[in-house]
């Protein structure tokens, strides 16, 4: 609970504000594997797909039903109740209202619930892609590493290759990779993301 409260209460980083300014008045969509509140504080929920879950929700650990529950208030109550031995009263442990199993944060794990909310996140993204398939589209990849390239990086590569007027930009100080097949449709920027976004906002007036 303490760790999750630190994550959920963390101040929004400046790069998120800069990105928000850059994208203002543009036709955009955000695909993220981040599970915190950084994006949802600044961008409308309908323009975000959090495909790896969200710390703001609980699910049943046994996945007995397709339901998600707000976790924020409960997490703060648990955090306040932690004693000097780092324990909380047993009766405060959140339990499933259906089967009584312990509740689990709705984030990627062995028991991650890929139910209605999960499908909605993918449906929103797919609807945006289909609507814009024949338009000029920029796939901007920010900070994707080599641990889970299958969620954002590889789909962006495939979509850039397939879409006629697509272009791909990856910004990463270490893992900015550009496939050979995208050498004429992409750009790898091996720089600090915060600096690139700040410079983009400063020198282009938010235009990108």
Residue map of PLM features:
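Conserved catalytic alpha/beta core of Sir2/sirtuin-type deacylases, generalized to analogous enzyme cores
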Residues: 1-208
């Amino acid at each position: 609970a303490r760790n999750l409260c630190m994550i959920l209460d963390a101040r929004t980083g400046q790069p998120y504000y800069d990105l928000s300014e850059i994208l203002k008045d543009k036709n955009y969509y955000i695909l993220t594997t981040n599970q915190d509140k950084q994006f949802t504080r600044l961008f409308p929920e309908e323009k975000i797909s959090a495909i790896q879950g969200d710390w703001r929700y609980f699910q049943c650990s046994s996945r007995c039903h397709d339901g998600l529950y707000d976790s924020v208030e409960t997490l703060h109550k648990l955090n306040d109740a932690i004693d000097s031995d780092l324990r909380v009263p047993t009766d405060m442990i959140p339990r499933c209202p259906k089967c009584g199993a312990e509740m689990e944060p709705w984030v990627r794990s062995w028991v991650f619930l890929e139910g209605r909310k999960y499908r909605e996140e993918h449906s929103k993204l797919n609807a945006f892609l289909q609507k814009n398939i024949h338009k000029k589209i920029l796939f901007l990849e920010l900070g994707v590493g080599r641990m889970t390239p299958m969620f954002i990086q590889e789909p962006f590569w495939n979509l850039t290759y397939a879409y006629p007027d697509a272009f791909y930009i990856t910004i990463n100080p270490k893992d900015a990779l550009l496939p050979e097949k995208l050498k004429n449709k992409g750009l790898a920027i091996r720089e600090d993301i915060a600096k690139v976004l700040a410079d983009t906002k400063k020198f282009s007036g938010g235009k990108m």
